[in-house]
Every structure is written in C-alpha cells, then in structure tokens.
Amino acid sequence: MHATGLAAPAGTPRLRKWPSKRRVPVSQPGMADPHQFFDDTSSAPSRGYGGQPSPGGLGYPPSSSDAAFLAAPMSNMAMVYGSSLAAQGKELVDKNIDRFIPVSKLKYYFAVDTVYVGKKLGLLVFPYLHQDWEVQYQQDTPVAPRFDINAPDLYIPAMAFITYILVAGLALGTQDRFSPDLLGLQASSALAWLTLEVVAILLSLYLVTVNTDLTTIDLVAFLGYKYVGMIGGVLTGLLFGKIGYYLVLAWCCVSIFVFMIRTLRLKILAQAAAEGVPVRGARNQLRMYLTMAVAAAQPVLMYWLTFHLVR
C-alpha cells in the first residue's frame, strides 16, 4: 500500500472500489429525518398528552365549562326576548278583544256557584213568594251573582240554551225526525229570535229616552232565562204527552212573566220606583208599556220555539 500523496507506479494494477455495504437510513413518509435533532412541528398536527391528536389546536382539550359559560347567556337572552314577545302579544290581543267583547265584564256574569244556581232556578219557577228584588251594591259596584240572587248572570242562560238544543234533538229523535240540518235550524232560529229581541228592546229604550243602567249583557241574561221553562215544558211533553206539556209550559210562562215584570221595573222604572211616585206622565206610561211588552213576549216565544217538538 502506497503512502498518501504519491502516485502509483506504472504497471501497478488499480484496485476497484466496491460500494460500501453500510446502510444509509432513508426517511419514510410520516417519519422524521434521522439527521434532524428536533421534530418539525410547523406542519404536523399538534399532539396532546399521550400522543393523541388534540382537537383544541393548542394541546389542551376544550373545556365543557367554557362552552356552558358561553351558551348560558345566549339561552337566557332568548328566554327573556321570547317572554317579552309573548307578553306584548297577549297585551295586544286583550286590547283588541276588549274593543268588541268586554271580557272583564263577562267574568262578573259567570261568577256563580252551586248554591246560587239552585236558588235562581227556584226563583225562576216560583217567583211569587220572593219579596226583595233589588240588586245589592258594594261601593257603587254590583256584587257578584253568587252573593246576590237578584243579580243577572250568563251561566244559567248559556247552559239552558245548550240544554234546550239537546232536548230538541232528543224530541226530534223520538219522532224519527232528527237530522243535523233540522237541529241546526232549531239553534239558529232560537239565536235569531234572541238577537231580534235585544235589538228591538234597545231601539225602544232609545226612542223612549230611558235613562237606565240596563246593559246589553243584562238584556241577554234576562231574555235567556226563558229557556229554563222551555226545557221543562218539552221534557214533560216527552214523558206525559201534550197535556203535561201545556200544563208545565203554562206555569213556566206565568212565572217568567212575573219574574220579568218585577225585575225590569227596577231597571226601566228605577227612578219612579225609588221615589215611590205614581206612574202618571206620558213618558213613564211608555216605559211601563215597554216593560209589559218585554215580559209578555217571553211566553209567546216559549210556545213558538217548542210547540212543534211535542206531538
């Protein structure tokens, strides 16, 4: 072997260098360079503890308390906003309804109980022994019907009207004449007559110039009491025939006539009745005639709306 830096003598064969069998590490995809001291984390996804990829992006898992903290104010704001919208909508609906239907006033006419209903039904059938017909007041406001039997209510007229329609359907069914159209005609005719009565009385009060505290709802209540006698007459007619129908209906007609006279005279003739002055003037005469006409119309309508139901 020759020293370094000296050329090999001529004729000496040159040795062939074979490639070294030492392995050179080759980097595989997904593996770090073996000659690199530190891992390149600029493009690789961050890893949390244990080598698992972290969805948070900073090596820490997202905290559930942070998400709840952010979601709570949003939900509270949504609830407050929704409740405010509901309150505004309710207020708007109440105002629009009160323009046409006095809901607050209607609550007064349905303030009844079982004792009142029983006493009022007895008064409608037997009004002859009742003495005190004046409505009681408390601080210039009439007391609720459940505390005063003389106060008008809408519960009995409404229930009586519905019951009358059901009894009419029963009567038509026993005679093999029932049909939905005929029952609807019965209900619509009863409502039409009631509406006509109210309009006629209000127009008459306007023409006679009567200053009274009788309201439209009071009129509907008083005029609706006649359905109680109509129910009794039709049921008796179904059980005992026409004789029973005429007897019971006649009694109920007289009773409702007396009831209406004694009730309306305190409404239409309130000033004259309070002062005890005899009704002699022309205007008071008209008021008395109006009271008599309203009371007399009740028996006529009671017969007209029920006579065809009993055969």
Curated annotation (Swiss-Prot):
Sites of N-acetylmethionine modification: M1
Function: Functions in endoplasmic reticulum to Golgi vesicle-mediated transport and regulates the proper organization of the endoplasmic reticulum and the Golgi. Plays a key role in targeting to neuronal dendrites receptors such as HTR1A. Also plays a role in primary cilium and sperm flagellum assembly probably through protein transport to these compartments.
Protein name: Protein YIF1B
GO term, biological process aspect, one: cilium assembly
Entry's Gene Ontology cellular component terms: endoplasmic reticulum; endoplasmic reticulum membrane; endoplasmic reticulum-Golgi intermediate compartment; Golgi apparatus; Golgi membrane
Glycoprotein among keywords: no
Membrane topology of this protein: Multi-pass membrane protein
InterPro entries per record: Yif1_fam
